[in-house]
Amino acid sequence: MMEPKSIFLLGLLLFRVGKLMRNDKLAWSAEYEAKKFKFYHNTSLFLTLQSTGPEMTNLCKKSWCDKVDDYFVVPHHYVNWQKPTEQWLIHHFSKMILHTRRLPQQAQWYMFAFDNNYFFVERLIKELSKFDSHLPIYTILRDFHADIQHKPVLIFSRSALNTFYDLEEENCSENAENVEEWLTTCMSIPPITISVDRSKKSRIFAIKRHFQVDEMKTMPNDYHDDKDYIHRHSSSLLSFTNLSLEDLKLLPIFVEKVQGGYKKKAASKILF
């Protein structure tokens, strides 16, 4: 039989061990919450990029693709290329999304795009970090102010991607008129909108091509189509789209020059 003093010491020891365990549990819980908060606001982004040719894809890799957390390139020779009608895009996006299911990756957000885009990735990630990826959230990025046909970009939260996998066979129909109608029907919920700013200006800039160099000279009134088109777009762009090979060669250089000049100007204001 244990002496009273021994029982007291054993009880004191158990009390202290229990207290330490509770403290460890609380510390672990706080650490988990901190990590969860950090993980939510430091958004991870996985990109599935459809190649239209090695030159275009390599230019994307050397510029904006390096800024996403990870990416997978669908080779251009895997695609049955034809005129990109909405029905063709629906079919192809469906294949891209389902193929991503086989890839060994874990991310909060998944983007599906062609290589004729240039993204301001940091700005996009900051925008996505406002939303909880545990909810079935998705968005469709397209320049709705452009009167030209161009390929959209799709972005899914992890939860939305799983929802698509679950509902794809039952809900999705490739007979929809456009990608927006197809995906909204598939998901059974509307997308969020991040492609326009508060002034309803587009944050996606689709590059337009002119038919002739001197077309403005034929106009009776002073008018500049390019200037008007630019002003219809937001000052906080998320991307340029409908880019040519030459566009992709030049655009990163222009962006670097503009951002470099802005940073120098900001630094000089701080110093002086």
UniProtKB/Swiss-Prot annotation:
Keywords: Signal. One of its GO terms (molecular function) is glycoprotein-N-acetylgalactosamine 3-beta-galactosyltransferase activity. It comes from the Eukaryota. Residues 1-20 form the signal peptide. The keyword Signal applies. This is Uncharacterized protein F37A4.3. The lineage of its organism: Eukaryota, Metazoa, Ecdysozoa, Nematoda, Chromadorea.
